[in-house]
Amino acid sequence: MFSILAITDNKLSSINQCNSIIYELKRISEKKIVVKYMKVYLGLLAYLPNSFIYFFLRIRYLLQPRKKIDFIISCGRISAPFNLVFKKNSNAKNCHILNPYFKKYEFDKIIMPEHDIKKETDKNVISTFGTLVDLTMFKKGSHKVLKLLNKKKKKISFLIGGNGKSSKIVFEELENTIKILNLLSEKYEVIYCFSRRTPSHIKDMVKEKAVSKHLFFPQKNVNPYWLLLNISEYIFVTADSISMISDSLSSGKKIYIVPIKKIKKKIRNFTQVILERKMAKIFSGKLENWKYKKLYETHKVCKKLIQTLNL
């Protein structure tokens, strides 16, 4: 039996990325894997640098009995100090997803997307193209949503990001795509899905300009994001989110990138590579058919982890 401790902050993306690795290890390993999850919350202490958090945790867990843990995986900045403290208490192998921001060489492996690597890659770093995607999420459906859909029409989804540290969207950048989708709605069922970052005024303007029969999500507590990736024939996605683009490309569906001007250079470079590799396209007047090798970075990462862990 192989024991894994997964440590995350309260972000859903952190949990999903840890799960992507855990589920793939379970799939390809011959050993039985048991997983324990730990969500960490530090309140005001979370604003401290990781080196200070680590010092505090070493004292806090100084007398904790040694536990049987074979592998520790963590995601989220404040989870990295917990990872190292429990590694010392258990002699487990460990791995952190994304930049731990301290003591990098004390992690057996660090999983980092290429767009976040600024210098030469360290020996303990496993690089990925885009973000890790939990492929089991594609299997999750929503009966409430399925009842709303037109079974006779193929689907086109428009995934809309929003504002944050890395991007800012203005409605004019979406307007042309909305007009295109209005025209395509005679043949296809069009579904819009907003992110948590989408400003309210953008949502209102999209709903105002779109054909009234189009569907808009999330609705209350229902967000069929993964279902839409699974059932859509075509996916339009704004260029402000590497994670949304990575999720879309992991579906193998035909992806159109909707350009956004105010985005960080690393995001712009990522979308440019996607377009150059012809994995996705920018809409040029008609829907096209093309094939590409869908993203499967989790499998590549886990093949390397299997060697490190002797699984």
Predicted regions and their residues:
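Active-site and donor-binding regions of nucleotide-sugar-utilizing enzymes
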Residues: A6-G130
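A donor-sugar binding/catalytic signature common to diverse glycosyltransferases
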Residues: K11-S14, Y225-I267
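Conserved catalytic-core segment of nucleotide-activated headgroup transferases in glycan assembly
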Residues: N163-C193
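Catalytic donor nucleotide-activated moiety binding site of glycosyltransferases and closely related
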Residues: K187-N221
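A nucleotide-sugar donor-handling region in carbohydrate enzymes
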Residues: Y105-V170, F283-L295, H299
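Extreme N-terminal starter segment of soluble prokaryotic enzymes
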Residues: M1-L5
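Leloir-type glycosyltransferase catalytic cores
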Residues: T271-L311
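Short internal beta-strands
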Residues: I110-P113, V190-R196, Y256-P259
